[in-house]
Amino acid sequence: MSTQIAPARISDPAAFGRVAVLLGGTSSEREVSLNSGSNVLDALRARGVDAQPVDGIPALAQALVAQRFDRVFNVLHGHNGGGEDGIVQGLMEAFGVPYTGSNVLGSALSMDKIRTKQVWLSLGLSTPRYARLAAGASAQQIHAAAEQIGLPVIVKPANEGSSVGVSRVFDQAQLDEAVTLAARYDGALLMEQLIEGDELTVAVLGDVALPSIRIVPKGQWYDYNAKYIAEDTQYLCPGLDGDAEAQIGQLALDAFRAAGCSGWGRVDVMRDGSTGQLYLLEVNTAPGMTSHSLVPKAARQLGIDFEALVWRVLEQTL
């Protein structure tokens, strides 16, 4: 599968009009979103775009009522005051304002890791074995789910990102602590089979899968610290070779489209170290745009710098 990005369609920054960079918010990913938004804002302004920051959904609603903006670049991460659960997409559609990223359905579905898995499985796409745990699940239910899936497992909130509230569990004694951590966040919990092997991610831009990235953290796994703070995490791009790289790119596109996503995003995948089997984990519909973020790294592999990447994403609103 060739990875070719068409040339930019727009050359005049005035074509975008007044652009709101939606950032911050009140989700658990606020700090990451502020960082992403600041980078996007700087890149747009460097290209001559009339861009202004807007912190959170209430501020955006006020701006839309006042007709202050012509379009929105959404880097509001997460849910519950974030911009990846379909709520802010519905707001922007109600005002008829174009925005970056997936629509209401794609955003809402992808924010719910459990429902996304159900869609993938219905289409024959591989994802780790899992169980849904309701908030307040009993110890008996928790341990029964782990026994059914088979240890080791990962326990996480079903609707959070950035590895917030995530634990790896290798024995029954660790389960209660993992569930307690994940239960600090709203909604159901997801317990899923832990796939031992390579952690990979594939960015999607338009209808093209960018080169995959294989993530090699210094520690045992790619947690919040490895994602946003540590300087010793290795990123290998492309992450795979030959047919395997083509396979993961096509899988990412299939998974992205199956979830109703469009515009741009990122699909996270595990590759079993013993069998080479690929397993879909989740879709991110407003990926990070920090100095550690993965979409910019993949774009650079194709000669697309950060400013050009931000421009390409915004182009999709025209």
From Swiss-Prot:
Pathway: Cell wall biogenesis; peptidoglycan biosynthesis
UniProt keyword annotation of Chloroplast present: no
UniProt key word Nucleotide-binding: yes
A GO BP annotation: cell wall organization
InterPro entries linked: ATP-grasp (IPR011761), ATP_grasp_subdomain_1 (IPR013815), D-Ala_lig_Van_CS (IPR000291), D_ala_D_ala (IPR005905), Dala_Dala_lig_C (IPR011095), Dala_Dala_lig_N (IPR011127), PreATP-grasp_dom_sf (IPR016185)
SUPFAM superfamilies, sorted: Glutathione synthetase ATP-binding domain-like (SSF56059), PreATP-grasp domain (SSF52440)
Binding, ATP: 146-201
Coiled coil: none
Recorded catalytic activity of this chain's protein: 2 D-alanine + ATP = D-alanyl-D-alanine + ADP + phosphate + H(+)
Broad class of where this protein is predominantly found: cytoplasm
Keywords: ATP-binding, Cell shape, Cell wall biogenesis/degradation, Cytoplasm, Ligase, Magnesium, Manganese, Metal-binding, Nucleotide-binding, Peptidoglycan synthesis
EC code(s) of this entry: 6.3.2.4
Cellular compartments annotated: Cytoplasm
HAMAP family: Dala_Dala_lig
Family note: Belongs to the D-alanine--D-alanine ligase family.
Function (record text): Cell wall formation.
Name listed for the protein in its UniProt record: D-alanine--D-alanine ligase B
Name of the gene this protein is made from: ddlB
